[in-house]
């Protein structure tokens, strides 16, 4: 199965590494599992966040909001698991960090082989605009496989 076939099956244009398109589609077919949730908790724990930590929609430590962007990127969803992140979810978490007076800086931690083209550029523009208007410093830590 090639990259074009995957985009046809997904019914959406993709911005994804061709070598990972098939794996992405297979991951999206699976239901979220307890293992996926546990992995999400493991990612949060890297930043010192545990389930008993104060409720924020992002990892938070020392005045910095850490927003993980993991797995396949999807339009029109707020999902945030180790294997999929929704563009709407990214926007919501950045908006929350911008509005949170405890947050002095924002880090987007990106580890993704890409995802849907639809929504990608709109998400980037919205995130850029919100952070710029907030005046809060930000940066993105990008894995070598940040495709979209």
Kindly give the residue locations of the regions a language model identified.
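N-terminal organellar transit peptides
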Residues: 1-148
């Amino acid at each position: 199965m090639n990259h074009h076939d995957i985009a046809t099956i997904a019914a959406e244009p993709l911005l994804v590494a061709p070598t990972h398109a098939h794996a992405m589609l297979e991951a999206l077919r699976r239901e979220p599992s307890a293992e996926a949730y546990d992995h999400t908790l493991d990612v949060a724990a890297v930043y010192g966040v545990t389930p008993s930590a104060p409720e924020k929609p992002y990892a938070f430590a020392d005045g910095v909001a850490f927003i993980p962007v993991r797995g396949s990127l999807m339009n029109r969803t707020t999902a945030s698991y180790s294997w999929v992140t929704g563009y709407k979810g990214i926007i919501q978490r950045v908006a929350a960090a911008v509005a949170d007076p405890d947050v002095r800086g924002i880090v987007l931690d990106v580890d993704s082989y890409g995802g849907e083209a639809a929504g990608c550029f709109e998400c980037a523009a919205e995130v850029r605009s919100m952070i710029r208007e907030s005046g809060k410093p930000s940066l993105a830590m990008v894995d070598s496989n940040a495709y979209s």
